[in-house]
Amino acid sequence: MKDNYILAFETSCDETSVAILKNGSELLCNIIASQINSHKRFGGVVPEIASRHHVEQITVCIEAALEEAEISADQLTAVAVTEGPGLNGALLVGIMAAKTFAWANHLPLIPVNHMAGHLMAASLVDTIEYPAMALLVSGGHSELVYVEKEGSYKKVGETRDDAAGEAYDKVGRVMGLTYPSGKVIDELAHKGQDTYNFPRAMMNTHEVEFSFSGLKSAFINLVHNENQKGNDVIANDLENLAASFQAAVVDVLMAKTKLAMEKYPVKTLIIGGGVSANQGLRERLSAEITDEKLIIPPLRLCGDNAGMIAAAAYIEWKKGLENVQAGLDLNAKPSLVFEDM
């Protein structure tokens, strides 16, 4: 049988990435050009800057991917690209590049949901036994997705307000940390203790939903109130603050994940998204998820990358191109959700 090679593009936010996947499991290359340093001074991603960086880097990434994989365009089976969700301008850069490459080389074009990519990154690590549950946590999303069988996605829970990663970044700003602050908060948390009684929203409800806005507000209010008393709690107790905040986030994520798995019994639990790099969350999952297979991708596959997009595209390709192939009128879908697939 002829080998399957998928060239994938990911430009949904602030990483320009191009990857080539062989036969759905062998990642030949996963080129990532990060823009973090360009966004740090703004405390978050600036869409216009992100788009300009994608334009500058996309061709370089394509050339690097083909060179590293030692693959020529005529060996490729298909081109895949993130169509959403994400920043509109950023998505369009990747989509235009993918459409141009596909058209020029007479290749089919497969659109991919960015969150399906985060989910299917697990398939690059281990075999997913179905049915499966996925906890997807990032700067823009916190959701639980039930995967009854390969390529079937049902969102069963999500955040009502802030995503977990968004809460980390906002709290990090209050702490005086540079963007992105999740890794630093995680490191500080491991040096401190859970000494502050921060709220765990919706812990006692039977709804598979998250809420982190109350936690964020409680953190900000505590810091403000302590400052009013003359206690610079950020300077005096930063590690315990970080530990208490992270404990609250992880408690909620764990509780709702377990609730989802009670409602939808599964064989595998997958974790994906940028926040899945959090060591505190990884430790809790490894300690408490013992009856189901647990797949946690390595750090290189947690953030945005085209390798995961290729993995999700391979699943779509197996459904038959007549069912999944996009035309050259493919457009960005910044608010794409699983229900739209």
Swiss-Prot record:
Q: Which cofactor does it need?
A: Fe(2+)
Q: Name one Pfam family in it.
A: TsaD
For this record, the Gene Ontology CC terms, alphabetical, are: cytoplasm
Instruction: Name where it mostly resides.
Output: cytoplasm
Substrates-to-products reaction catalysed: L-threonylcarbamoyladenylate + adenosine(37) in tRNA = N(6)-L-threonylcarbamoyladenosine(37) in tRNA + AMP + H(+)
Question: Where on this chain does substrate bind?
Answer: L136, V137, S138, G139, G140, D169, G182, D186, N278
What biological process terms from GO does the record include? Answer: tRNA threonylcarbamoyladenosine modification
Q: Which domain of life is it from?
A: Bacteria
Co-factor binding comment: Binds 1 Fe(2+) ion per subunit.
A Gene Ontology MF term for this entry?
N(6)-L-threonylcarbamoyladenine synthase activity
Q: Which InterPro entries match?
A: ATPase_NBD, Gcp-like_dom, KAE1/TsaD, TsaD
Q: Which UniProt keywords apply?
A: Acyltransferase, Cytoplasm, Iron, Metal-binding, Transferase, tRNA processing
In terms of Gene3D superfamilies, this protein maps to: 3.30.420.40
Known function: Required for the formation of a threonylcarbamoyl group on adenosine at position 37 (t(6)A37) in tRNAs that read codons beginning with adenine. Is involved in the transfer of the threonylcarbamoyl moiety of threonylcarbamoyl-AMP (TC-AMP) to the N6 group of A37, together with TsaE and TsaB. TsaD likely plays a direct catalytic role in this reaction.
Q: What is this protein called?
A: tRNA N6-adenosine threonylcarbamoyltransferase
Classification lineage? Bacteria, Bacillati, Bacillota, Bacilli, Lactobacillales
Gene encoding this polypeptide? tsaD
